[in-house]
Amino acid sequence: MENYNLIIVGAGPAGLAAAISAKSRGMDRILVIERMEAPGGIPLQCLHTGFGKRRYGVELKGTVYADRLLGEVSKEIELWTNAFVLAVSRDGTVTVSGTGGMCKCSARAVILATGCRERPIGSLPVYGTRPSGIFTAGSVQRMINLNGYRVGSRVVVLGSGDVGMIVSHHLSEHGAQVLAVLEKEQKLGGLVRNRHRYLDPHAIPVILGSTVTQVYGERRLEAVQVCPVDKKGKPIPASGYRLACDTLVTSVGLIPELELMEDLGAELCRQNTDVRTSLPWLFVCGNARRVHSLVDTVEQDGVQASIAACEYLSGIIGG
C-alpha cells in the first residue's frame, strides 16, 4: 500500500489549487485523485469567460483557465484520473477504484475537494411521465460544449441562476429556441449582468414567480405545465397553462458532495469560513464545503485547506 502525506480527492479548481499551494509550502508525497477522464473540473465544459480574474488578472474561458491551472501543477504531484474514491477510513486508508482495478493507499491528511452535484428533477414536485428531453443544465453544457450535440428545438429552462442563463445562451447559439426561463422566486436567481449578457441578445423572456408542475409526453417531451406561485411559493393550478416544448432544462440548485465525510461520521466546523472538520486530519474545500458563485473563491478555499493541512502535518511530521 502506497503511503502519502496528503491525498486530495477531486482535481477541479479547489483540488488543484490545494495541491499547488501545498507543494509551494514544501509538502511532498501529494496525491490528487480525479474520477473524470481529465483534471480541471467544471471549467472544462465552460466556453464562456469569467474564470481566473483573481489568479491571472484577466477573465478567461473555462477551458483556458483549466489548462493554465493544470500547468501550475508540479510533476512531483501524483495525479490519478478515471479513479473513483469509494471510501476513506478513520485510519487514513483511501480505497480507490480505477481502470486497473481496486487499490488502497494511506494518507496522513486528506482534503475533500469533491465539488457538488445538480439537483435532479426527481427532487422536485413535478408530476407526469419521464420522457426523453429532460436534462440538468450541467449535462446540457457537456453535450453542447464537449460533444457538439444539439439538445433540442423548443426549450424551457427552469431556474434563473447564472448557470441557467448561460446554458440558455449556449442553446440559442446552437440553434434552439429558448421559449422562456422560469423562476419560482420573484427575483432573478443570478446576476443581472448575466441576464443582459446571455438572455437579452436572444430575446429570451424570464418569467418570475412561476414553475413547472407537470410534464407531458411518452417517448419524447411534448409540453410542460407552467404555474404561477403564491407568496408562499405554492403553485396556483387554476392559473396554470400548457406550454409546448421538446426539451426541459433544470437549473434548480446544487448539492455538496459530502458522502465520504458523512460515512466517516465527521462534521464540518460550524464556522462558515472554516475548512476543518471534526477529524483533525480531514479537510473540506470548494463547492463540497459550500456552493460558491465564483471560481476565485473556490480557489481560495483550496488554498486555505492546504494551509490548514500543512499546519496539521507539520505538527505530526515535525517539519
What are these regions (language model features)?
Residues 1-319:
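Residues forming the flavin
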